[in-house]
Amino acid sequence: MGSLNPKSLLHAALLSTALCGPGITNAQDVITDDTYFYGQSPPVYPSPEMPGNGSWASAYSKAVALVSQMTMAERANLTVGKSEGLNGCNGLTGSVPRLNFKGICMNDAGNGLRDTELVNSWPSGVHMGASWNKNLTYHRGYNMAGEFKTKGINVALGPVVGPFGRVPIGGRNWEGMDTDPYLSGKIAAQTVSGIQDAGIIASVKHFIGNEQEYKRNPSGNVSAVSSNIDDKTMHELYLWPFADTVHAGAACVMCSYNRLNNSYACQNSKAQNGLLKTELGFEGFVVSDWGALHAGHAAAEAGLDVVMPSSDLWGVSGENLTASVANGSLAESRLTDMATRIVASWYQMGQDKDFPELGLASSYLTPHTKVNARDPSSKPILLSGAMEGHVLVKNINNALPLKKPELLSIFGYDAPVSSQSNIGNIRYSYGTEAILDLNITDTPIDISLQIASNGTLTAGGGSGSNAPPYISAPFDALQEQAYNDDTSLFWDFVSVDPDVDAGSDACLVFLNAYSMENSDRPGLYDEFSDTLVNNVASKCNNTIVTIHNVGIRLVDQWIEHPNVTAVIFGHLPGQDSGRALVKLLYGVESFSGKLPYTIAKNESDYNVYNHSAPEGIYTQFPQSDFSEGVYLDYRDFDAKNITPRFEFGFGLTYTTFKYSDLSSSVVSNASTAYLPPITTIIQGGAQSLWDVVAEVQATVSNNGTMAAMEVAQLYVGIPNGPVRQLRGFEKVNIPVGESAVVEFELTRRDLSEWSVEEQSWVLQQGSYGIWVGSSSRNLPLTGNLIIGGS
């Protein structure tokens, strides 16, 4: 990382009721002694054996044949990560050389392949959530996975659907998609399909309830935080996107660090055996997050199949598991199933034939063979992905698009490229080291970990980041555009109160909101950046603000300033950040992104704002009670009639769209019975849950002056539930003067609620509200869908 000033050293130090019950009581209020912290999550045993059904039948058959040739010691060896011979892998399972099984190499995947050179840095999860583009997301996953395959890596450790974004200040929210289960599920499922169609195992993470970084791991005699989630909330929010990814065929799921209802997630039998492997019919293997194992064979009995990165509890080669089999405390069939699930996933992706040799290096500081994994065909996907995650939320006085300005003034620490992106920080990146402080001398404000002040932010920090081959920073791209347009530029990237040429046609201000793994954010805005915006706006009547943000960033400190004419949430675009932004600023392409979360006016508008901290008598057992249930983000704002600054699903374009011709109907012969028909369990749950029950259709017309993409959104009011819930979206490109018909299919699951009493999804009889429009609060088309009668 290079030398750090004392302030940076401080920053570096800072870096260093049961699921079946009707609800969760506040845990701190019912504790009488520490025995409370045991048995809060109901036991579900035995761990189901791999079904081997449907599309997995062939892989399962091959795996059974191969595993049957292994000794018990060899089977156990497959289940434990290796601390030696990694050769650049972040994790590596055991191997069986005599049977030509080389082991499974795993690497992180948030922005692309981590801990290596000659790969691309892709738009982040939150950026793709803001794109609302399923097809683009698929191609991002496919092309990204192609780089993993070229490097000989078997498993991409992504996508992320947990954290779900419950806590706005959550440090890893940027790796996930959004705060809505439907949107998150659809975007993540497309990511899984893309990754696995390229022949790479997708590892969906983190299962489950991993909603804060603070106290995510045990420390000393203090346990990891317990996410206390009731049955209904679990199914309707947190489990929902996992079901979508399993339905898409996900071959791996990673269990999380936190405790779930006071049982560590990686040894929680209700979660792994009950929800994942039984209810969702998961065919693949469960791998622990790195260092998340806290039990011996009990974790295997609870459904864990692979421990990473190594384990003394299971033994270096799994010898403690074989000993447990020998003494009868672990069933031999369980160990065999663990090995079978691993090998079947390998076969399912076709990795047994012509899979590339490992193309990583154990050290990049010594001579090594270079393997360039970048495919030129990825370039348009990288650029489109970068563009479509930008969200324009304000544009007055025709501020945008820019039209060959004579003079632009550019301000803010986020405009240039960071001063460092070298081989030393490919292992565990902090947003390409943009977090290192600039020598900002004209302000006493402590910016702490709120911003990355050393250059433009293209990704958050931690294991989800990687080393980009280049960064197109906003200032770089603006200079190139200035050359083409003969525009003159002034710039100041360090001052909080810069001089401003009064003749500037526009003043562009660049700031960011940063977060990283291992810590949560200090807040949702920072005084330094807000002061900068207000100071520039006081001197420039056409101030355009771009924020590269990891998630929710409040703007009410300056959003109504009359001289702030345009505001863009740029999210985390990856390596093509500046190139993409300039195309949008100058109207080569229209903005098309939509917010995947709600921007409030105040922190207090969020019913859950901060992470949970230890309190009460038993501070060694931190509790986080998810007592808000399903009412998060826009669902809560709607229920309480809170006016947001910018609502979920909001985003402007350079044109105008008109919605018309809403129609809806129940599919003929579809079952609308209260309980779903009894069907087989497929990947993702009971087959009947995926049956299409109803269809909705609407027309979107481009009445403006520029071709652009619009995201048509369908919301449904399910009886006894939130006011409305997202249940469909389609992104369509519509030329000027033309129209597009958007069609939405509603499955039984989409229209159902989870019944704790029935332990089933149930379809209420009656009238369902239907809304279609451009955001969660701009819904010009309204109607009703009648289920089960008139």
Task: Annotate each language-model stretch with its function.
Residues 23-754, 760, 767-772, 776-777:
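Glycoside hydrolase catalytic-domain context in secreted enzymes
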Residues 765-769, 785-787:
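A short, solvent-exposed, low-complexity linear motif enriched for acidic/polar residues
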Residues 1-28:
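Fungal secretory targeting signals
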Residues 778-790:
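Short beta-strand elements
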